[in-house]
Amino acid sequence: MTPDIAICDSTFCDSLPKSLIANSGIDAITHAIEAYVSVAQNDFTKMHSLQALELLFQNLSESYHTGTVVSRDAVHRGATIAGIAFSNSFLGVCHSLAHQVGSTFHIPHGSTNGILLPHIIMYNASRKPTRMGIFPSYKYPQSYERYSEIAEHIGADRSDPQGLVEKINNLMKDLSMPLSFKEANIPEKEYMSKVEAMAESAFDDQCTPANPRFPLVSELKHILIEAYDSP
């Protein structure tokens, strides 16, 4: 369902709990990053993704801590622009897995995405993926270069995928968000008992085909296991 209009009125968030500001912002960042590396990306979506990420990384922390009108307005615009990007290029396996973990353990969607995103970035950044995504708009794997472009654009300390991961983790810490599912207080035994089912369901999620690296179920299981106690 794609909206015809978006009402970007930051006063709607005046009484919003800070945790929702953080979760919504990280979800928007995930939207923009996944849209940028999607197999269906194009010049228009790349432009929107980068502008969204610039606005979000520059303003989300201030929006969370002090809630100024300027920062809230910028985050609203960034989230909307990210929506324009992913509604035209779709998302990837970060959202595929987040849908399963969130619905199984009832933790916020933004937190789930934020925990998974660093693992997905490093998984997708492989220069020799097991298999590329279906019908990509490019000839060779490009995820490493695209994550590096994002890292450089947002001023990460390193212009490579690891630099992007560090930038995301530092923002998550600043927003008092968990960096692993263990930190999100999900019981380990219960979590591990659901890993296989969650991986299988994520494989069939509508977001998976747009991921730049077409996953094996075993690889999705590995990502879920890794994300339990490792940021």
Language-model features: where?
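A glycine/threonine-rich phosphate-anchoring loop and its flanking beta-alpha core
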Residues: 1-41, 127, 138, 142-149
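Short alpha-helical scaffolding segments that buttress acidic/His motifs in well-ordered protein cores
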Residues: 29-33, 75-83, 97, 117-121, ...
